[in-house]
Amino acid sequence: MSENRMPKITKTNEEWRAALTPEQYRVTREHGTERPFTGPFLDNKRHGTYKCVCCGRALFRSDTKFDSGCGWPSYFAPVDPDAIAEYVDRSHLMVRTEIRCADCDAHLGHVFPDGPPPTGLRYCLNGTAMTFEED
């Protein structure tokens, strides 16, 4: 877990608010969650790279995306393990592993140990926290 890691990109709340939509700010800066089956990219089948909406860091490739049925875009591996920082999340009377962008500390979603091979992991992302760059 990355409890004491410092983000590489820091901005004030006002700077983040100016750069993001209200929903992007709520999800990424206030650790919000979009409603299931409502976010962008859930049904995206194009080939490309999913990037952090806050800083543009490459996070996931389309070839690691799978339909988990949970209502959020899901991936079995990041493009680079160093792209994601993991934190213990004890909110909502649960213990989960939160994932954030390693460069700007944006809340992305959570990772669960119930994914497909080869990793057995399910990175469950808020689509609002990402952009998509087609190949």
From Swiss-Prot:
Species per Swiss-Prot/TrEMBL record: Rhizobium meliloti (strain 1021)
Cofactor(s) of this protein: Zn(2+)
UniProt KW keywords: Metal-binding, Oxidoreductase, Zinc
PANTHER family for the chain: METHIONINE SULFOXIDE REDUCTASE, METHIONINE-R-SULFOXIDE REDUCTASE B1
Highest rank taxon of the organism: Bacteria
GO molecular function: peptide-methionine (R)-S-oxide reductase activity; zinc ion binding
Annotated catalytic residues: C124
Cofactor binding remark: Binds 1 zinc ion per subunit. The zinc ion is important for the structural integrity of the protein.
Enzyme Commission number, as recorded: 1.8.4.12
Alphabetical list of Pfam families matching this protein: SelR
Name of the protein described by the UniProt record: Peptide methionine sulfoxide reductase MsrB 1
GO cellular component term of the entry, any: cytoplasm
